[in-house]
Amino acid sequence: MKQKLLILIVLLIGSTMCFAQPLVSYRFEERSLSLGGGYTNMLDTYLSPLKYQGAHVSVLGERFTQTQAESKRWFTQSLFYLHGDYATPRSGSGLTVSGMADYSYTSYYKVAAKGEQFRFYAGPQGQLRIGGIYNLRNSINPAQLKLGVNLAASAMIKYVFTGWHIPMNVRLQADLPLLGIAFGPNYGQSYYEIFYLGQGKGCVHMTALHNNLSLRSNFSYDIQLHPCTLRLTLANDLYQWTLGRQHYRMFSHSVMVGCVKDLYHVGREEEAKKSIPY
């Protein structure tokens, strides 16, 4: 009798789980990797009073995640942007190379959604930039370290549609730094004095809109193919500092091509695809 009762309980639990499967919650995640190149224009008065122009290559990795399985309003985004530049002045007598690594983490709230097509997101963003510039023309102080941390505001607009029976979407994202901290030597101050002699007072600066008016924007176009979604991105990055009497500005414009992969961490994939939260 007890064995029959146990079997009945197991069967009831199993049948309940089977019927409940379509209602199992899930957490959606989108990952992408893009490669590209374009044009750069930079000025760093610590190294040279001249403007340098040249080639720009970049790698962009993104992770866009739904924070909770039950929530369709809160999302997080992690962006890793690795880029390098090779530039010369207008005269052609000189060369500057640079390499930067940018990381940002954003907490997005879906402010508005019009049907299943239009979505608008906004939220705070933390930014970290580290890298360096090397001027082959200089014999004294040929290099410049770039290090900064920012609190920024980010906004994203996304429009989903179908063309030629293929799911597509366009997306525009813009990030504006508001407050931060940056490292930069003072006028005439060498890195030998800062790191070897320990005379680094005044090298850490507070930044805001008055001395760090920067903007990063990405316009992307996604075409859903198999086994992944094709992403075409137009990336623009305007970054400038005025620290003490030193001015730094870098503007880059690049075209990128990449692949997007959707992941479903919990629940059944076919059910999740029917109601992607963003």
Go through the PLM ranges and name each one.
Residues 59-68, 101-109, 124, 151-159, ...:
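Residues on the lipid-exposed face of transmembrane beta-strands in outer-membrane beta-barrel proteins
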Residues 43-52, 85-95, 138-144, 203-207, ...:
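Extracellular loop and loop/strand-boundary signature of outer-membrane beta-barrel proteins
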Residues 22-29, 66-75, 110-120, 162-169, ...:
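Short loop/turn motifs that connect adjacent beta-strands in outer-membrane beta-barrel proteins
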Residues 173-175, 183-185, 201, 205, ...:
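Predominantly the C-terminal beta-signal and adjacent terminal strand-loop region
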Residues 31-41, 76-84, 122-132, 157, ...:
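Transmembrane beta-barrel strands of outer-membrane/channel proteins
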Residues 20-73, 276-278:
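Short glycine/proline- and aromatic-enriched beta-strand/turn motifs that initiate or cap beta-hairpins
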Residues 29, 51-60, 93-103, 118, ...:
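Residues that define the transmembrane beta-barrel architecture of outer-membrane proteins
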Residues 140-227:
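Outer-membrane beta-barrel transmembrane domain signature
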